């Protein structure tokens, strides 16, 4: 059986886009969502600041990620959990307990995203030799930054424009 090695161009850009978008959802979009839903600034600051904890403690649980299963398994599983978490946020908004429910889902997103970061970086290190790692470090960083820009700027702008259009139509 042949050992087929896929081109890093086939997976590095999308892997690092997928790494950046959930981070933006947890750290930026959660704050905007809670502000638009009428949560007080004090509560927003207190509860959303705790959402950063999974990224802070990544070094403590990364050895467990290295021991259990493969990096690819962790990447795929975390991407599925992130997708479910993003859908979960949408389902929690119309509830009467949206703040508590969405905060729990944002916690799931934060831990899934931080675990995805560990697995993605580990997969990158295993799949590429040192020369390829040196070549792709800028590409990986660029696509992560594109995800940050798209999540913070583009998505927020589009949603704000969409919201304003609906408010204008409602006032007619």
Where are these regions (language model features)?
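Central cavity-lining transmembrane alpha-helices of secondary-active solute carriers
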Residues: 46-63
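C-terminal ends and interior cores of transmembrane alpha-helices
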Residues: 80-96
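Cytoplasmic membrane-interface "Motif A"-like loop-to-helix N-cap segments
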Residues: 67-79
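Small-residue (Gly/Pro/Ala) motifs that create kinks and tight helix-helix packing interfaces
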Residues: 151-159
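Conserved small/polar residues in nucleotide/adenosyl-binding loops
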Residues: 161-170
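Glycine-rich segments within core transmembrane alpha-helices of 12-TM secondary carriers
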Residues: 138-152
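Helix-loop boundary and gating motifs at the non-cytosolic
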Residues: 4-51
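Hydrophobic core of transmembrane alpha-helices in multi-pass small-molecule transporters
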Residues: 98-116
């Amino acid at each position: 059986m042949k050992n087929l090695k896929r081109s890093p161009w086939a997976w590095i850009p999308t892997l690092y886009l997928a790494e950046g978008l959930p981070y933006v959802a947890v750290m930026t979009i959660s704050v905007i969502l809670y502000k638009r839903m009428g949560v007080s600034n004090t509560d927003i600051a207190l509860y959303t600041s705790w959402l950063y904890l999974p990224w802070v403690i990544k070094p403590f649980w990364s050895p467990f990620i290295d021991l259990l299963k493969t990096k690819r398994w962790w990447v795929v599983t975390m991407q599925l959990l992130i997708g479910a978490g993003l859908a979960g946020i949408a389902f929690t908004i119309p509830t009467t307990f949206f703040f508590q429910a969405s905060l729990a889902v944002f916690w799931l997103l934060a831990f899934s995203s931080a675990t995805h970061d560990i697995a993605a970086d580990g997969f990158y290190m295993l799949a590429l030799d040192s020369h390829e790692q040196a070549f792709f470090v800028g590409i990986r960083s660029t696509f992560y930054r594109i995800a940050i820009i798209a999540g913070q700027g583009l998505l927020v702008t589009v949603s704000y424009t969409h919201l304003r259009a609906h408010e204008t139509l409602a006032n007619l």
